Protein backbone atom coordinates (compact mmCIF):
# COMPACT_ATOMS: atom_id res chain seq x y z
CA UNK A 1 0.00 0.00 0.00
CA UNK A 2 2.73 2.55 0.83
CA UNK A 3 4.33 1.77 -2.54
CA UNK A 4 1.09 2.47 -4.41
CA UNK A 5 0.59 5.66 -2.42
CA UNK A 6 4.10 6.88 -3.31
CA UNK A 7 3.53 6.02 -6.97
CA UNK A 8 0.25 7.94 -6.90
CA UNK A 9 1.97 10.97 -5.44
CA UNK A 10 4.70 10.82 -8.10
CA UNK A 11 2.09 10.57 -10.86
CA UNK A 12 0.19 13.54 -9.43
CA UNK A 13 3.34 15.62 -8.96
CA UNK A 14 4.55 14.83 -12.49
CA UNK A 15 1.19 15.75 -14.02
CA UNK A 16 1.12 19.03 -12.12
CA UNK A 17 4.68 19.78 -13.22
CA UNK A 18 3.82 19.08 -16.88
CA UNK A 19 0.77 21.34 -16.65
CA UNK A 20 2.87 24.03 -14.98
CA UNK A 21 5.47 23.92 -17.77
CA UNK A 22 2.85 23.96 -20.54
CA UNK A 23 0.79 26.61 -18.77
CA UNK A 24 3.83 28.81 -18.24
CA UNK A 25 4.80 28.63 -21.91
CA UNK A 26 1.21 29.26 -22.99
CA UNK A 27 0.83 32.30 -20.71
CA UNK A 28 4.17 33.71 -21.91
CA UNK A 29 3.11 33.21 -25.53
CA UNK A 30 -0.44 34.58 -25.24
CA UNK A 31 0.36 37.61 -23.09
CA UNK A 32 3.41 38.51 -25.17
CA UNK A 33 5.06 40.09 -22.13
CA UNK A 34 8.20 42.00 -23.17
CA UNK A 35 11.17 42.85 -20.99
CA UNK A 36 12.61 45.43 -23.38
CA UNK A 37 11.45 46.95 -26.66
CA UNK A 38 11.95 49.94 -28.93
CA UNK A 39 9.41 52.77 -29.09
CA UNK A 40 7.26 51.25 -31.84
CA UNK A 41 8.14 47.64 -30.96
CA UNK A 42 10.32 47.14 -34.02
CA UNK A 43 12.69 45.20 -31.76
CA UNK A 44 11.81 43.49 -28.49
CA UNK A 45 12.79 40.69 -26.15
CA UNK A 46 10.01 39.00 -24.21
CA UNK A 47 9.25 36.24 -21.75
CA UNK A 48 8.50 33.61 -24.41
CA UNK A 49 11.85 34.22 -26.11
CA UNK A 50 13.61 34.08 -22.75
CA UNK A 51 12.03 30.69 -21.98
CA UNK A 52 13.15 29.22 -25.31
CA UNK A 53 16.61 30.72 -24.91
CA UNK A 54 16.94 29.28 -21.42
CA UNK A 55 15.85 25.87 -22.73
CA UNK A 56 18.54 25.85 -25.43
CA UNK A 57 21.16 27.04 -22.94
CA UNK A 58 20.22 24.36 -20.38
CA UNK A 59 20.17 21.64 -23.02
CA UNK A 60 23.62 22.65 -24.26
CA UNK A 61 25.03 22.78 -20.72
CA UNK A 62 23.82 19.30 -19.74
CA UNK A 63 25.04 17.90 -23.08
CA UNK A 64 28.48 19.38 -22.40
CA UNK A 65 28.54 17.84 -18.91
CA UNK A 66 27.56 14.44 -20.31
CA UNK A 67 30.31 14.60 -22.94
CA UNK A 68 32.81 15.41 -20.21
CA UNK A 69 31.69 12.29 -18.32
CA UNK A 70 32.03 10.21 -21.51
CA UNK A 71 35.61 11.35 -22.01
CA UNK A 72 36.41 9.96 -18.57
CA UNK A 73 35.94 6.48 -19.97
CA UNK A 74 35.58 3.57 -17.58
CA UNK A 75 36.56 -0.03 -17.11
CA UNK A 76 36.73 -2.23 -20.18
CA UNK A 77 34.03 -4.90 -20.59
CA UNK A 78 34.99 -8.35 -19.36
CA UNK A 79 34.54 -9.96 -22.76
CA UNK A 80 32.68 -12.84 -21.10
CA UNK A 81 29.15 -11.54 -21.72
CA UNK A 82 27.31 -13.09 -24.65
CA UNK A 83 26.33 -10.53 -27.31
CA UNK A 84 24.39 -10.97 -30.55
CA UNK A 85 24.24 -8.39 -33.34
CA UNK A 86 20.88 -8.34 -35.14
CA UNK A 87 20.77 -6.76 -38.61
CA UNK A 88 17.47 -5.88 -40.32
CA UNK A 89 17.70 -5.84 -44.14
CA UNK A 90 15.16 -4.67 -46.71
CA UNK A 91 15.92 -4.15 -50.43
CA UNK A 92 19.35 -2.86 -49.50
CA UNK A 93 21.81 -1.24 -51.89
CA UNK A 94 24.46 -3.96 -52.45
CA UNK A 95 27.30 -1.49 -51.91
CA UNK A 96 25.95 -0.38 -48.54
CA UNK A 97 25.27 -3.95 -47.43
CA UNK A 98 28.84 -5.01 -48.20
CA UNK A 99 30.21 -2.05 -46.25
CA UNK A 100 27.95 -2.95 -43.34
CA UNK A 101 28.99 -6.61 -43.21
CA UNK A 102 32.68 -5.82 -43.65
CA UNK A 103 32.47 -3.45 -40.70
CA UNK A 104 30.78 -6.23 -38.71
CA UNK A 105 33.74 -8.50 -39.41
CA UNK A 106 36.04 -5.85 -37.92
CA UNK A 107 34.19 -5.51 -34.59
CA UNK A 108 36.61 -5.96 -31.74
CA UNK A 109 34.33 -7.82 -29.32
CA UNK A 110 35.29 -11.54 -29.07
CA UNK A 111 32.89 -14.32 -30.12
CA UNK A 112 30.24 -11.88 -31.32
CA UNK A 113 27.32 -13.67 -32.97
CA UNK A 114 25.52 -12.14 -35.96
CA UNK A 115 21.96 -12.62 -37.22
CA UNK A 116 20.80 -10.88 -40.40
CA UNK A 117 17.09 -11.21 -41.21
CA UNK A 118 16.03 -10.25 -44.74
CA UNK A 119 12.50 -8.89 -45.16
CA UNK A 120 11.56 -10.85 -48.27
CA UNK A 121 12.23 -14.37 -49.59
CA UNK A 122 11.85 -13.97 -53.35
CA UNK A 123 14.54 -14.25 -56.00
CA UNK A 124 14.75 -10.45 -56.05
CA UNK A 125 15.87 -10.54 -52.41
CA UNK A 126 18.36 -13.38 -52.88
CA UNK A 127 21.29 -11.06 -53.59
CA UNK A 128 21.39 -10.00 -49.92
CA UNK A 129 21.92 -13.58 -48.76
CA UNK A 130 24.61 -14.02 -51.43
CA UNK A 131 26.45 -10.94 -50.15
CA UNK A 132 26.18 -12.24 -46.58
CA UNK A 133 27.78 -15.55 -47.58
CA UNK A 134 30.42 -13.76 -49.63
CA UNK A 135 31.53 -11.44 -46.81
CA UNK A 136 31.07 -13.65 -43.74
CA UNK A 137 32.68 -16.74 -45.27
CA UNK A 138 31.76 -20.37 -44.60
CA UNK A 139 33.18 -21.06 -41.16
CA UNK A 140 30.40 -20.93 -38.57
CA UNK A 141 27.97 -19.56 -41.17
CA UNK A 142 24.52 -20.79 -42.14
CA UNK A 143 21.80 -19.33 -44.37
CA UNK A 144 18.11 -20.21 -44.30
CA UNK A 145 15.22 -19.44 -46.66
CA UNK A 146 11.92 -19.48 -44.77
CA UNK A 147 8.67 -19.60 -46.77
CA UNK A 148 6.80 -18.01 -43.88
CA UNK A 149 7.57 -15.97 -40.77
CA UNK A 150 6.64 -16.37 -37.11
CA UNK A 151 3.19 -14.87 -37.60
CA UNK A 152 2.27 -16.60 -40.86
CA UNK A 153 3.24 -20.18 -40.06
CA UNK A 154 0.36 -22.51 -40.80
CA UNK A 155 -0.46 -25.63 -38.84
CA UNK A 156 2.50 -27.91 -38.88
CA UNK A 157 4.75 -24.95 -39.72
CA UNK A 158 6.70 -25.36 -36.50
CA UNK A 159 9.42 -27.06 -38.53
CA UNK A 160 10.47 -23.71 -39.98
CA UNK A 161 10.50 -22.09 -36.54
CA UNK A 162 12.59 -24.90 -35.12
CA UNK A 163 14.99 -24.63 -38.05
CA UNK A 164 15.52 -20.93 -37.40
CA UNK A 165 16.05 -21.43 -33.67
CA UNK A 166 18.47 -24.32 -34.17
CA UNK A 167 20.61 -22.31 -36.58
CA UNK A 168 20.71 -19.28 -34.30
CA UNK A 169 21.76 -21.54 -31.45
CA UNK A 170 24.47 -23.49 -33.31
CA UNK A 171 26.07 -21.05 -35.78
CA UNK A 172 28.00 -17.83 -35.22
CA UNK A 173 26.79 -16.13 -38.42
CA UNK A 174 23.20 -16.65 -39.56
CA UNK A 175 21.23 -15.13 -42.44
CA UNK A 176 17.47 -15.72 -42.62
CA UNK A 177 15.26 -14.81 -45.57
CA UNK A 178 11.58 -14.78 -44.65
CA UNK A 179 8.21 -13.76 -46.03
CA UNK A 180 7.79 -9.98 -46.23
CA UNK A 181 6.22 -8.42 -43.15
CA UNK A 182 8.00 -5.13 -42.43
CA UNK A 183 10.95 -4.17 -40.26
CA UNK A 184 9.17 -5.01 -37.02
CA UNK A 185 8.57 -8.54 -38.29
CA UNK A 186 12.22 -9.22 -39.12
CA UNK A 187 13.36 -7.74 -35.82
CA UNK A 188 10.85 -9.92 -33.99
CA UNK A 189 12.24 -12.99 -35.75
CA UNK A 190 15.76 -12.25 -34.55
CA UNK A 191 14.67 -11.57 -30.95
CA UNK A 192 12.29 -14.56 -30.80
CA UNK A 193 14.83 -16.99 -32.23
CA UNK A 194 17.40 -15.90 -29.64
CA UNK A 195 15.16 -16.52 -26.66
CA UNK A 196 17.13 -16.24 -23.43
CA UNK A 197 20.33 -17.69 -24.92
CA UNK A 198 22.30 -14.40 -24.71
CA UNK A 199 22.76 -11.55 -22.24
CA UNK A 200 22.79 -8.55 -24.60
CA UNK A 201 21.40 -7.76 -28.04
CA UNK A 202 22.88 -5.14 -30.36
CA UNK A 203 20.74 -3.81 -33.21
CA UNK A 204 21.91 -2.49 -36.56
CA UNK A 205 20.48 -1.57 -39.96
CA UNK A 206 21.84 -3.00 -43.19
CA UNK A 207 23.04 0.41 -44.43
CA UNK A 208 25.23 1.03 -41.37
CA UNK A 209 29.02 1.00 -41.09
CA UNK A 210 30.09 0.20 -37.52
CA UNK A 211 33.18 1.44 -35.72
CA UNK A 212 35.29 -1.52 -34.46
CA UNK A 213 34.90 -0.46 -30.81
CA UNK A 214 31.16 0.32 -30.88
CA UNK A 215 30.01 -2.96 -29.30
CA UNK A 216 32.52 -2.83 -26.45
CA UNK A 217 31.71 0.82 -25.66
CA UNK A 218 27.96 0.23 -25.35
CA UNK A 219 28.44 -3.00 -23.42
CA UNK A 220 30.69 -1.20 -20.93
CA UNK A 221 27.83 1.12 -19.93
CA UNK A 222 25.36 -1.75 -19.50
CA UNK A 223 27.81 -3.77 -17.39
CA UNK A 224 28.73 -0.79 -15.19
CA UNK A 225 25.15 0.13 -14.25
CA UNK A 226 22.47 -2.58 -13.79
CA UNK A 227 19.77 0.12 -13.84
CA UNK A 228 20.54 0.94 -17.49
CA UNK A 229 18.35 -1.12 -19.81
CA UNK A 230 19.47 0.22 -23.17
CA UNK A 231 22.19 2.38 -24.70
CA UNK A 232 22.61 4.08 -28.05
CA UNK A 233 25.64 5.35 -29.92
CA UNK A 234 26.60 8.27 -32.13
CA UNK A 235 25.00 7.87 -35.57
CA UNK A 236 26.45 10.02 -38.34
CA UNK A 237 25.99 10.17 -42.11
CA UNK A 238 27.72 7.72 -44.46
CA UNK A 239 26.80 9.51 -47.70
CA UNK A 240 27.26 13.05 -46.38
CA UNK A 241 28.55 14.55 -49.63
CA UNK A 242 26.21 12.76 -52.02
CA UNK A 243 23.74 15.68 -52.22
CA UNK A 244 22.81 18.94 -50.54
CA UNK A 245 20.02 17.25 -48.58
CA UNK A 246 22.34 14.58 -47.15
CA UNK A 247 24.92 17.28 -46.35
CA UNK A 248 22.42 19.33 -44.32
CA UNK A 249 21.03 16.16 -42.72
CA UNK A 250 24.50 15.34 -41.41
CA UNK A 251 24.38 18.45 -39.21
CA UNK A 252 20.91 17.64 -37.95
CA UNK A 253 22.11 14.13 -37.03
CA UNK A 254 25.08 15.54 -35.13
CA UNK A 255 22.90 17.95 -33.17
CA UNK A 256 20.26 15.30 -32.45
CA UNK A 257 22.78 12.87 -31.00
CA UNK A 258 25.53 15.00 -29.50
CA UNK A 259 23.33 17.68 -27.96
CA UNK A 260 19.75 16.44 -27.61
CA UNK A 261 20.43 12.78 -26.79
CA UNK A 262 23.55 13.65 -24.80
CA UNK A 263 21.42 15.98 -22.66
CA UNK A 264 18.78 13.27 -22.16
CA UNK A 265 21.52 10.78 -21.29
CA UNK A 266 22.71 13.06 -18.47
CA UNK A 267 19.37 12.35 -16.79
CA UNK A 268 19.19 8.70 -17.90
CA UNK A 269 16.17 9.14 -20.15
CA UNK A 270 17.21 8.94 -23.83
CA UNK A 271 13.85 8.74 -25.60
CA UNK A 272 14.97 6.98 -28.78
CA UNK A 273 17.82 4.50 -29.16
CA UNK A 274 18.35 4.67 -32.90
CA UNK A 275 18.09 1.50 -35.00
CA UNK A 276 21.52 1.78 -36.65
CA UNK A 277 23.37 1.55 -33.32
CA UNK A 278 21.85 0.38 -30.05
CA UNK A 279 22.15 -2.32 -27.41
CA UNK A 280 19.65 -3.74 -24.93
CA UNK A 281 19.52 -6.20 -22.08
CA UNK A 282 18.03 -9.32 -23.65
CA UNK A 283 16.08 -10.16 -20.50
CA UNK A 284 14.06 -6.96 -21.02
CA UNK A 285 13.52 -7.63 -24.72
CA UNK A 286 12.17 -11.10 -24.02
CA UNK A 287 9.89 -9.74 -21.30
CA UNK A 288 8.04 -7.24 -23.52
CA UNK A 289 8.67 -8.80 -26.95
CA UNK A 290 5.04 -9.80 -27.62
CA UNK A 291 3.63 -6.48 -26.38
CA UNK A 292 6.15 -4.59 -28.51
CA UNK A 293 5.30 -6.57 -31.65
CA UNK A 294 1.52 -6.35 -31.17
CA UNK A 295 1.54 -2.60 -30.46
CA UNK A 296 -1.61 -0.83 -31.64
CA UNK A 297 -2.62 2.81 -31.90
CA UNK A 298 -6.24 3.91 -32.23
CA UNK A 299 -7.19 0.33 -33.05
CA UNK A 300 -4.56 -0.12 -35.79
CA UNK A 301 -1.44 -2.27 -35.64
CA UNK A 302 1.72 -0.16 -35.67
CA UNK A 303 4.20 -0.90 -38.44
CA UNK A 304 6.79 1.86 -37.93
CA UNK A 305 8.51 3.56 -35.02
CA UNK A 306 10.03 0.24 -33.89
CA UNK A 307 13.18 1.75 -32.40
CA UNK A 308 11.40 4.46 -30.45
CA UNK A 309 8.86 1.99 -29.09
CA UNK A 310 11.63 -0.42 -28.03
CA UNK A 311 13.19 2.44 -26.08
CA UNK A 312 9.84 3.39 -24.58
CA UNK A 313 9.26 -0.18 -23.44
CA UNK A 314 12.58 -0.09 -21.58
CA UNK A 315 11.66 3.25 -19.99
CA UNK A 316 8.21 1.95 -19.06
CA UNK A 317 9.86 -0.68 -16.83
CA UNK A 318 11.73 2.02 -14.92
CA UNK A 319 15.13 1.27 -16.46
CA UNK A 320 17.37 4.10 -17.57
CA UNK A 321 18.54 4.64 -21.14
CA UNK A 322 21.90 6.16 -22.05
CA UNK A 323 23.88 7.56 -24.98
CA UNK A 324 27.60 7.34 -25.60
CA UNK A 325 29.52 9.24 -28.27
CA UNK A 326 32.38 6.75 -27.81
CA UNK A 327 30.33 4.20 -29.78
CA UNK A 328 30.06 5.35 -33.38
CA UNK A 329 28.64 4.36 -36.73
CA UNK A 330 27.85 5.80 -40.14
CA UNK A 331 24.49 5.26 -41.84
CA UNK A 332 22.81 6.14 -45.12
CA UNK A 333 20.37 9.03 -45.37
CA UNK A 334 18.10 9.98 -48.30
CA UNK A 335 19.79 12.07 -50.97
CA UNK A 336 16.60 13.16 -52.70
CA UNK A 337 14.26 15.76 -51.25
CA UNK A 338 11.03 13.75 -51.60
CA UNK A 339 12.47 10.62 -50.03
CA UNK A 340 13.89 12.69 -47.17
CA UNK A 341 10.51 14.38 -46.68
CA UNK A 342 8.67 11.04 -46.51
CA UNK A 343 11.23 9.73 -44.02
CA UNK A 344 10.82 12.80 -41.80
CA UNK A 345 7.02 12.50 -41.94
CA UNK A 346 7.21 8.85 -40.86
CA UNK A 347 9.59 9.72 -38.01
CA UNK A 348 7.32 12.56 -36.91
CA UNK A 349 4.33 10.22 -36.82
CA UNK A 350 6.17 7.79 -34.58
CA UNK A 351 7.41 10.66 -32.40
CA UNK A 352 3.94 12.02 -31.64
CA UNK A 353 2.45 8.55 -31.23
CA UNK A 354 5.20 7.47 -28.85
CA UNK A 355 4.99 10.81 -27.03
CA UNK A 356 1.52 9.80 -25.82
CA UNK A 357 2.77 6.39 -24.73
CA UNK A 358 5.86 7.86 -23.11
CA UNK A 359 3.76 10.25 -21.03
CA UNK A 360 2.43 7.27 -19.06
CA UNK A 361 5.90 6.73 -17.59
CA UNK A 362 7.05 10.28 -16.90
CA UNK A 363 6.70 9.64 -13.16
CA UNK A 364 9.27 6.82 -13.27
CA UNK A 365 12.07 9.09 -14.44
CA UNK A 366 13.75 12.44 -13.84
CA UNK A 367 11.58 15.56 -14.22
CA UNK A 368 13.76 16.63 -17.13
CA UNK A 369 12.08 13.94 -19.22
CA UNK A 370 8.68 15.50 -18.50
CA UNK A 371 9.92 19.04 -19.08
CA UNK A 372 11.68 18.31 -22.37
CA UNK A 373 8.80 16.23 -23.72
CA UNK A 374 6.36 19.07 -23.09
CA UNK A 375 8.62 21.72 -24.64
CA UNK A 376 9.61 19.74 -27.75
CA UNK A 377 6.17 18.18 -28.21
CA UNK A 378 4.27 21.47 -28.31
CA UNK A 379 6.96 23.66 -29.89
CA UNK A 380 5.96 23.00 -33.56
CA UNK A 381 2.39 24.15 -32.86
CA UNK A 382 3.55 27.35 -31.15
CA UNK A 383 5.92 27.95 -34.05
CA UNK A 384 3.21 27.52 -36.69
CA UNK A 385 0.98 29.96 -34.80
CA UNK A 386 3.86 32.46 -34.60
CA UNK A 387 4.64 32.25 -38.32
CA UNK A 388 1.01 32.66 -39.37
CA UNK A 389 0.55 35.56 -36.96
CA UNK A 390 3.63 37.41 -38.23
CA UNK A 391 2.86 36.82 -41.91
CA UNK A 392 -0.68 38.16 -41.51
CA UNK A 393 0.04 41.26 -39.42
CA UNK A 394 0.37 43.32 -42.56
CA UNK A 395 3.89 44.66 -41.89
CA UNK A 396 6.93 43.62 -43.94
CA UNK A 397 9.21 44.23 -40.96
CA UNK A 398 7.48 41.48 -38.94
CA UNK A 399 8.24 38.93 -41.65
CA UNK A 400 11.85 40.07 -42.03
CA UNK A 401 12.37 40.11 -38.26
CA UNK A 402 11.12 36.53 -38.05
CA UNK A 403 13.53 35.41 -40.79
CA UNK A 404 16.42 37.20 -39.06
CA UNK A 405 15.54 35.62 -35.71
CA UNK A 406 15.42 32.11 -37.22
CA UNK A 407 18.86 32.53 -38.76
CA UNK A 408 20.29 34.15 -35.62
CA UNK A 409 19.24 31.15 -33.52
CA UNK A 410 20.67 28.88 -36.23
CA UNK A 411 24.01 30.72 -36.15
CA UNK A 412 24.21 30.53 -32.34
CA UNK A 413 23.54 26.77 -32.37
CA UNK A 414 26.01 26.30 -35.22
CA UNK A 415 28.68 28.28 -33.36
CA UNK A 416 28.18 26.12 -30.27
CA UNK A 417 28.48 23.00 -32.46
CA UNK A 418 31.71 24.35 -34.00
CA UNK A 419 33.20 24.79 -30.52
CA UNK A 420 31.98 21.45 -29.15
CA UNK A 421 33.05 19.45 -32.21
CA UNK A 422 36.10 21.50 -33.08
CA UNK A 423 35.08 21.60 -36.74
CA UNK A 424 34.46 24.89 -38.58
CA UNK A 425 32.30 23.07 -41.15
CA UNK A 426 29.53 22.95 -38.52
CA UNK A 427 28.75 26.61 -39.30
CA UNK A 428 26.72 25.31 -42.26
CA UNK A 429 24.29 23.82 -39.74
CA UNK A 430 22.59 27.23 -39.63
CA UNK A 431 21.33 26.55 -43.17
CA UNK A 432 19.23 23.68 -41.82
CA UNK A 433 16.91 26.15 -40.10
CA UNK A 434 15.45 27.20 -43.46
CA UNK A 435 14.87 23.54 -44.38
CA UNK A 436 13.12 23.07 -41.04
CA UNK A 437 10.85 26.09 -41.49
CA UNK A 438 9.87 25.36 -45.10
CA UNK A 439 9.61 21.56 -45.07
CA UNK A 440 9.99 19.80 -41.74
CA UNK A 441 7.55 22.03 -39.85
CA UNK A 442 4.58 21.38 -42.19
CA UNK A 443 5.59 17.70 -42.33
CA UNK A 444 5.23 17.50 -38.54
CA UNK A 445 1.73 18.97 -38.64
CA UNK A 446 0.80 16.64 -41.51
CA UNK A 447 2.16 13.72 -39.47
CA UNK A 448 -0.23 14.54 -36.63
CA UNK A 449 -3.21 14.80 -39.01
CA UNK A 450 -2.39 11.48 -40.75
CA UNK A 451 -1.01 9.71 -37.69
CA UNK A 452 -3.09 6.56 -38.34
CA UNK A 453 -1.58 6.02 -41.80
CA UNK A 454 1.13 3.35 -41.72
CA UNK A 455 3.75 1.72 -43.94
CA UNK A 456 7.52 1.60 -44.36
CA UNK A 457 7.43 5.28 -45.26
CA UNK A 458 10.81 5.13 -46.97
CA UNK A 459 11.41 2.69 -49.81
CA UNK A 460 14.30 0.28 -50.00
CA UNK A 461 17.59 1.64 -51.28
CA UNK A 462 18.05 -0.79 -54.16
CA UNK A 463 14.85 0.30 -55.88
CA UNK A 464 13.77 3.82 -54.96
CA UNK A 465 10.04 4.58 -55.15
CA UNK A 466 8.94 8.20 -55.55
CA UNK A 467 6.05 9.19 -53.27
CA UNK A 468 4.66 12.68 -53.85
CA UNK A 469 2.34 12.61 -50.82
CA UNK A 470 4.97 14.43 -48.76
CA UNK A 471 4.60 17.47 -51.01
CA UNK A 472 0.97 17.99 -49.93
CA UNK A 473 1.71 19.68 -46.57
CA UNK A 474 4.64 21.63 -48.04
CA UNK A 475 2.43 22.94 -50.86
CA UNK A 476 -0.32 23.94 -48.42
CA UNK A 477 2.25 25.63 -46.18
CA UNK A 478 3.68 27.61 -49.09
CA UNK A 479 0.18 28.72 -50.08
CA UNK A 480 -0.44 29.95 -46.52
CA UNK A 481 2.84 31.88 -46.52
CA UNK A 482 2.18 33.25 -50.01
CA UNK A 483 -1.23 34.44 -48.85
CA UNK A 484 0.47 36.24 -45.97
CA UNK A 485 2.90 37.94 -48.33
CA UNK A 486 0.07 39.08 -50.62
CA UNK A 487 -1.93 40.37 -47.65
CA UNK A 488 1.14 42.19 -46.29
CA UNK A 489 1.82 43.78 -49.68
CA UNK A 490 -1.79 44.96 -49.83
CA UNK A 491 -1.67 46.44 -46.31
CA UNK A 492 1.68 48.15 -46.86
CA UNK A 493 0.45 49.70 -50.12
CA UNK A 494 -2.22 51.53 -48.08
CA UNK A 495 0.09 52.31 -45.17
CA UNK A 496 3.52 53.52 -46.37
CA UNK A 497 6.69 52.83 -44.39
CA UNK A 498 7.75 55.31 -41.73
CA UNK A 499 11.31 56.62 -41.84
CA UNK A 500 12.30 54.49 -38.84
CA UNK A 501 10.67 51.38 -40.27
CA UNK A 502 12.42 51.93 -43.59
CA UNK A 503 15.77 52.16 -41.81
CA UNK A 504 15.10 48.88 -39.97
CA UNK A 505 14.00 47.22 -43.21
CA UNK A 506 17.10 48.27 -45.14
CA UNK A 507 19.44 47.26 -42.30
CA UNK A 508 17.69 43.92 -41.79
CA UNK A 509 17.57 43.14 -45.51
CA UNK A 510 21.29 43.89 -45.88
CA UNK A 511 22.17 41.69 -42.89
CA UNK A 512 19.96 38.85 -44.14
CA UNK A 513 21.33 39.15 -47.66
CA UNK A 514 24.95 39.21 -46.44
CA UNK A 515 24.33 36.07 -44.38
CA UNK A 516 23.04 34.11 -47.35
CA UNK A 517 25.68 35.41 -49.74
CA UNK A 518 28.45 34.45 -47.30
CA UNK A 519 27.08 30.98 -46.46
CA UNK A 520 26.14 30.07 -50.03
CA UNK A 521 29.51 31.28 -51.33
CA UNK A 522 31.30 29.11 -48.78
CA UNK A 523 29.03 26.19 -49.64
CA UNK A 524 29.66 26.50 -53.38
CA UNK A 525 33.40 26.94 -52.86
CA UNK A 526 34.00 24.20 -50.29
CA UNK A 527 31.14 21.71 -50.39
CA UNK A 528 29.18 21.73 -53.67
CA UNK A 529 32.11 20.40 -55.71
CA UNK A 530 32.21 17.34 -53.46
CA UNK A 531 28.47 16.64 -53.62
CA UNK A 532 26.97 14.18 -56.08
CA UNK A 533 29.84 11.71 -55.72
CA UNK A 534 30.02 8.57 -53.59
CA UNK A 535 33.36 9.43 -52.11
CA UNK A 536 34.60 7.43 -49.17
CA UNK A 537 35.26 10.50 -47.03
CA UNK A 538 34.51 8.75 -43.77
CA UNK A 539 35.72 9.34 -40.23
CA UNK A 540 35.88 5.59 -39.63
CA UNK A 541 38.48 3.28 -41.17
CA UNK A 542 37.00 0.97 -43.80
CA UNK A 543 39.74 -1.56 -44.37
CA UNK A 544 38.74 -4.48 -46.55
CA UNK A 545 38.36 -7.81 -44.77
CA UNK A 546 40.40 -10.73 -45.95
CA UNK A 547 39.31 -12.63 -49.02
CA UNK A 548 36.05 -14.46 -48.27
CA UNK A 549 36.16 -18.18 -47.84
CA UNK A 550 34.02 -20.48 -50.01
CA UNK A 551 30.37 -19.60 -49.60
CA UNK A 552 28.20 -21.31 -47.03
CA UNK A 553 25.35 -23.37 -48.34
CA UNK A 554 21.82 -22.00 -48.16
CA UNK A 555 19.21 -24.20 -46.54
CA UNK A 556 15.58 -24.28 -47.56
CA UNK A 557 12.99 -26.21 -45.59
UniProtKB/Swiss-Prot annotation:
<keyword id="KW-0808">Transferase</keyword>
<feature type="transmembrane region" description="Helical; Name=6">
    <location>
        <begin position="464"/>
        <end position="484"/>
    </location>
</feature>
<dbReference type="GO" id="GO:0050501">
    <property type="term" value="F:hyaluronan synthase activity"/>
</dbReference>
<feature type="topological domain" description="Cytoplasmic">
    <location>
        <begin position="420"/>
        <end position="430"/>
    </location>
</feature>
<feature type="topological domain" description="Cytoplasmic">
    <location>
        <begin position="1"/>
        <end position="10"/>
    </location>
</feature>
<keyword id="KW-1133">Transmembrane helix</keyword>
<feature type="transmembrane region" description="Helical; Name=1">
    <location>
        <begin position="11"/>
        <end position="31"/>
    </location>
</feature>
<dbReference type="GO" id="GO:0031410">
    <property type="term" value="C:cytoplasmic vesicle"/>
</dbReference>
<dbReference type="GO" id="GO:0085029">
    <property type="term" value="P:extracellular matrix assembly"/>
</dbReference>
<keyword id="KW-0333">Golgi apparatus</keyword>
<feature type="topological domain" description="Extracellular">
    <location>
        <begin position="32"/>
        <end position="44"/>
    </location>
</feature>
<protein>
    <recommendedName>
        <fullName>Hyaluronan synthase 3</fullName>
        <ecNumber>2.4.1.212</ecNumber>
    </recommendedName>
</protein>
<dbReference type="GO" id="GO:0000139">
    <property type="term" value="C:Golgi membrane"/>
</dbReference>
<feature type="transmembrane region" description="Helical; Name=5">
    <location>
        <begin position="431"/>
        <end position="451"/>
    </location>
</feature>
<dbReference type="GO" id="GO:0005886">
    <property type="term" value="C:plasma membrane"/>
</dbReference>
<keyword id="KW-0812">Transmembrane</keyword>
<dbReference type="InterPro" id="IPR029044">
    <property type="entry name" value="Nucleotide-diphossugar_trans"/>
</dbReference>
<feature type="topological domain" description="Cytoplasmic">
    <location>
        <begin position="485"/>
        <end position="501"/>
    </location>
</feature>
<feature type="transmembrane region" description="Helical; Name=2">
    <location>
        <begin position="45"/>
        <end position="65"/>
    </location>
</feature>
<feature type="transmembrane region" description="Helical; Name=4">
    <location>
        <begin position="399"/>
        <end position="419"/>
    </location>
</feature>
<keyword id="KW-1003">Cell membrane</keyword>
<feature type="topological domain" description="Cytoplasmic">
    <location>
        <begin position="66"/>
        <end position="367"/>
    </location>
</feature>
<keyword id="KW-0328">Glycosyltransferase</keyword>
<keyword id="KW-0472">Membrane</keyword>
<feature type="transmembrane region" description="Helical; Name=3">
    <location>
        <begin position="368"/>
        <end position="388"/>
    </location>
</feature>
<comment type="similarity">
    <text>Belongs to the NodC/HAS family.</text>
</comment>
<comment type="pathway">
    <text>Glycan biosynthesis; hyaluronan biosynthesis.</text>
</comment>
<feature type="topological domain" description="Extracellular">
    <location>
        <begin position="452"/>
        <end position="463"/>
    </location>
</feature>
<feature type="topological domain" description="Extracellular">
    <location>
        <begin position="523"/>
        <end position="557"/>
    </location>
</feature>
<keyword id="KW-0968">Cytoplasmic vesicle</keyword>
<dbReference type="GO" id="GO:0030213">
    <property type="term" value="P:hyaluronan biosynthetic process"/>
</dbReference>
<comment type="function">
    <text>Catalyzes the addition of GlcNAc or GlcUA monosaccharides to the nascent hyaluronan polymer. Therefore, it is essential to hyaluronan synthesis a major component of most extracellular matrices that has a structural role in tissues architectures and regulates cell adhesion, migration and differentiation. This is one of three isoenzymes responsible for cellular hyaluronan synthesis.</text>
</comment>
<dbReference type="GO" id="GO:0000271">
    <property type="term" value="P:polysaccharide biosynthetic process"/>
</dbReference>
<feature type="topological domain" description="Extracellular">
    <location>
        <begin position="389"/>
        <end position="398"/>
    </location>
</feature>
<dbReference type="Pfam" id="PF13641">
    <property type="entry name" value="Glyco_tranf_2_3"/>
</dbReference>
<feature type="transmembrane region" description="Helical; Name=7">
    <location>
        <begin position="502"/>
        <end position="522"/>
    </location>
</feature>
